[in-house]
């Protein structure tokens, strides 16, 4: 029994094994088919992309050649600016639109937006110099200290008026150094030297005081100047006397007398007579005829308050 049952079981087991392997084969075939289809689709999409690129490149080349030919045919025609591309023509100021019955103009909303866009983009970072920039320590005003006030010129412009700069004050040092010492004349120096001599002699109790070498040099220079001036005066006098002869000396004295006679008025003699009342000698009293007057206080009747009578203590007590 055991031998008969074993081959039947084996046959059933084999069938079961083959039945289990069948779906795995189907899945493998399905996966292979899907992979092949995906590869074919990828290749087809890649080919379509490459074909599109080739078409766009060829069309761009043809359009560029056509545009170049058209630009060459025209006389330097300016290309129009697209919305995305930034061009120089867009940075120009927008045209003004005037009203029908007024002198003033009103910009349209498009032009105002363009103007704002233009001013935002045209402003450069180096518009203001370092001198105008804001510093943390100083005030927030961008103007320098010597620019004060502004004058309105146009819509977007202002001109700053420059205030006059003050001239710097001359520096005055309070210290009396050698470079800026007090200038004294020779006479003032002499006076100060004599005062210093007298004070030193009184303090030390010495009559003849020896001066230092610096002051001695000054005294020696003064003595030399005095001697030279006196010698020059004597030489000039001697030279003048030697040049003149004795006849010229006598003639010079006579000329001096004549000059004095011409310049001085002539004196007239006064004649005294009884008829001439003006030219009479004065009848002034002599010393012998003059009388000596006494003081008014000494004479009793010439006193200002009359005679004063002394009153004793006994008389004042009796009256009471």
From Swiss-Prot:
Predominant location category: nucleus
Q: Entry's InterPro entries? A: RSRP1
Q: Which Pfam families match?
A: RSRP
Q: In which residue ranges is the amino acid composition biased (Low complexity)?
A: 24-48, 56-74
> What is one Gene Ontology biological process annotated in the Swiss-Prot or TrEMBL record?
spliceosomal complex assembly
GO cellular-component term (any): nucleus
Spell out the subcellular localization from the entry: Nucleus
Q: Where is the composition biased (Basic residues)?
A: 75-102, 114-158, 166-175
- Record PTM: Phosphorylated. Phosphorylation at Ser-135 and Ser-137 mediates the interaction with spliceosome proteins.
Q: Which residues carry this modification: Phosphoserine?
A: 135, 137
Q: What keywords are annotated for this sequence in UniProt?
A: Nucleus, Phosphoprotein
Polar residues bias locations: 271-293
- Compositionally biased tracts (Basic and acidic residues): 1-22, 215-238
Region (Disordered) location: 1-180, 215-299
- Family, as annotated: Belongs to the RSRP family.
Query: What's this protein's function?
Result: Probably acts as a spliceosomal factor that contributes to spliceosome assembly and regulates the isoform switching of proteins such as PARP6.
Q: What is this protein called?
A: Arginine/serine-rich protein 1
Q: Which organism is it from?
A: Danio rerio (Zebrafish)
Could you tell me the gene encoding this protein?
rsrp1
């Amino acid at each position: 029994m055991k031998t008969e049952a074993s081959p039947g079981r084996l046959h059933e087991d084999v069938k079961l094994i083959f039945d289990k392997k069948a779906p795995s084969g189907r899945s493998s075939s399905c996966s292979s088919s899907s992979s092949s289809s995906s590869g074919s689709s990828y290749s087809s999409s890649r080919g379509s992309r490459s074909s599109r690129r080739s078409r766009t490149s060829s069309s761009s080349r043809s359009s560029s050649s056509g545009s170049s030919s058209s630009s060459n045919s025209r006389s330097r025609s300016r290309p129009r600016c697209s919305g995305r591309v930034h061009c120089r023509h867009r940075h120009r100021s927008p045209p003004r639109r005037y009203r029908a019955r007024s002198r003033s103009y009103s910009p349209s909303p498009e032009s105002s937006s363009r103007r704002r866009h233009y001013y935002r983009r045209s402003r450069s970072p180096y518009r203001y110099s370092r001198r105008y920039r804001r510093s943390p320590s100083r005030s927030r005003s961008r103007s320098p200290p010597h620019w004060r006030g502004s004058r309105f010129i146009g819509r977007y412009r202002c001109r700053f008026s420059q205030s006059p700069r003050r001239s710097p004050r001359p520096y005055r040092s309070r210290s009396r150094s050698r470079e800026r010492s007090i200038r004294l004349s020779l006479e003032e120096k002499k006076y100060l030297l004599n005062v210093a001599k007298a004070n030193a002699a009184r303090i030390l109790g010495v009559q003849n005081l020896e001066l230092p070498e610096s002051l001695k040099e000054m005294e020696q220079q003064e003595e030399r100047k005095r001697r030279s001036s006196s010698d020059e005066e004597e030489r000039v006098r001697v030279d003048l006397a030697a040049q003149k002869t004795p006849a010229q000396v006598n003639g010079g004295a006579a000329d001096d007398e004549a000059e004095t006679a011409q310049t001085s008025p002539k004196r007239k003699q006064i004649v005294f007579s009884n008829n001439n009342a003006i030219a009479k000698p004065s009848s002034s009293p002599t010393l012998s005829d003059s009388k000596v007057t006494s003081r008014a206080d000494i004479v009793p009747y010439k006193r200002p308050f009359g005679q004063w009578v002394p009153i004793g203590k006994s008389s004042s007590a009796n009256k009471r």
